[in-house]
Amino acid sequence: MRTLVMVACAVSLAACSSPPKPPTVSGRHRIPINSPAAQEELRLQVFPQEPTAQATMWPARPPKQTVNVYFPQDVTVFRPTSAQINQLHTLLWPVPKHINVRGLTDNSCPPPGDTQVARVRALAIYNWLINQGVPASRITISYAPVKDYASNAPLSPGRVLNRRVDIEILRK
C-alpha cells in the first residue's frame, strides 16, 4: 500500500512540473496599435463618452422690451391675470440686467393724489417682481402723475391707456 501511495505521489508531482503548452496565435485579430483608428478606439475605451445634458438656450431677445400693466381707476393693488403672469415670466427669465418700473396715472385727481397713486402702483409691481425672484438691485422705480400719455383723449376709453405701469426690461 505504501508503494502505491508513493507511486501516485510521484506521478502527480511529475505531472505538475511539466510546462503548459504555449498558446497558438492565429494573427487574425491583430490591429496596428499606432494607427489613427486604433488610437481613437483606445481613447473611447479609456474615456467613454457620457451623455451630456442639453443646455437650455433662450431665444434671442431684443435688448429692450416694455410691458404695460393697466389698472382700473384709483386701484393700486396688482392682481395679475394668468396671461399677464405667463407674459412676465417669459420676459423675466433669464433674469434681465435691469428693470425700470414707471408708474403713471391719467391725471384725474389733483397732483398730490395722482402722485401717490402712481407711486403705490409702481411699488406693487416692484414687490411682485421681487417675489418672483428678481434681485432688488436690478430694479429701478419711478412715478409721475402727468407724463408720457399713451392717449390724450379726455374721455374714459383714452384715460384707461394712461392708468398704467410701464415695465421696461433691459438685457444689455
UniProtKB/Swiss-Prot annotation:
It is found in: Cell outer membrane. PROSITE patterns: OMPA_2, PROKAR_LIPOPROTEIN. The keyword Signal applies. Its main location: membrane. A lipid is attached at C16 (N-palmitoyl cysteine). Residues 58-172 form the OmpA-like domain. Residues 1-15 form the signal peptide. Keywords: Cell outer membrane, Lipoprotein, Membrane, Palmitate, Signal, Virulence. Gene3D superfamilies: OmpA-like domain. Coiled coil: none annotated. This is Type IV secretion system putative outer membrane lipoprotein BMEII0036. It comes from Brucella melitensis biotype 1 (strain ATCC 23456 / CCUG 17765 / NCTC 10094 / 16M).
